[in-house]
Amino acid sequence: MTKKRAVITGMGSISCIGNDLKEISNSLRQGISGISKNDEYDDLGFRSKVSGSILIDLKDLIDRKLFRFMGEAAAYSYLSALDALRDAKLPESIFETDRIGVIAGSGGASSRSQVDAADIL
């Protein structure tokens, strides 16, 4: 069995405590949790009224034609992947090869996306 090597060259993240690695690191060092009261949850009748909301305007950061086919979780993953490319100092053209991969994680779809999907049903 041939061993294959993997190299982590860059990281990117968007979260309720920051929209890039520097902001997230600073928030962690300062003990900022990012959890706050969410009035929208109250309006929707949720029992829990708190959330770790991400404060970023996706429509300002992603081309409209691309964004219209993305859910919020996919959009956050996309922006995080672009940050990872910048962190690695790699050009976006690197995606033209089949020797690159992105490992992405998400806490799940947004509550708003779930409510919208239920309304469609």
Predicted regions and their residues:
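Conserved "HGTGT" condensation-loop signature of ketosynthase/thiolase-family condensing enzymes
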Residues: 1-121
